[in-house]
Amino acid sequence: MKVWTIANQKGGVGKTTSVASLAGALAKRGKRVLMIDTDPHASLGYYLGVDSEEVPGSLFDVFVAHNHLTKELVKSHIVPTLVDGLDLLPSTMALATLDRALGHQEGMGLVLRNLLALVADEYDVAIVDCPPVLGVLMVNALAASQHIVIPVQTEFLAIKGLERMVKTMEIMGRSKKTRYSYTVVPTMFDKRTKASPAALQVLSEQYGESLWRDVIPVDTKFRDASLAHLPASHYASGCRGVKAYERLLDFLLAGEFGHVKIG
């Protein structure tokens, strides 16, 4: 099972949209996909029509039981979405208390990796929606991942967020004696503005080797798809945003980014 984490320490850059869009594109190709929402705001669940307050269990409950994980326990907290082949391990606001409640316990940084190993034979790909805050959840998301996708809105404030994210991975990589493989993905690109092309140029200059050589354009169909609780691939399959995520998926599946590592 492939494991990808979608992460950035700035909100509003397209993380949740990227998770839903990549997962939807994979489902269109007949792949079994597990999405894991590690953000206490539970945006991914709401996007896909899963109310975090109505689910019988959540990722928080799995963390609480981290010393007694079984495949059956993990599967009992996974819920289906409206799309065949797309499942979700949902978040709740209780995750916001995780650092205070359990963060000091030994082994808490590997809970997500361990739970994914238990269901690895059930799915082709797992995609993690990462919170923007550095803590136990982000540590888990990065540790569990084989590759990290960093969506960056093509505007200058978002580039500052990218700098913090890369610095975080560098620090964590050194402390854990590991190396993180990542790709920077320009999102919300609007060629009609001066800001988007200018920001893209800066990204190319600063992150050339790790930058995906394409963009995710601004597309109102993403908002419409979330209203319908569907990935855009299952709502407006011909739109330019969906086609861009199809190209990104091809890139990720090809695995041509192995040389881009930090740590």
Label each region the model flagged:
Residues 1-263:
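P-loop NTP-binding core
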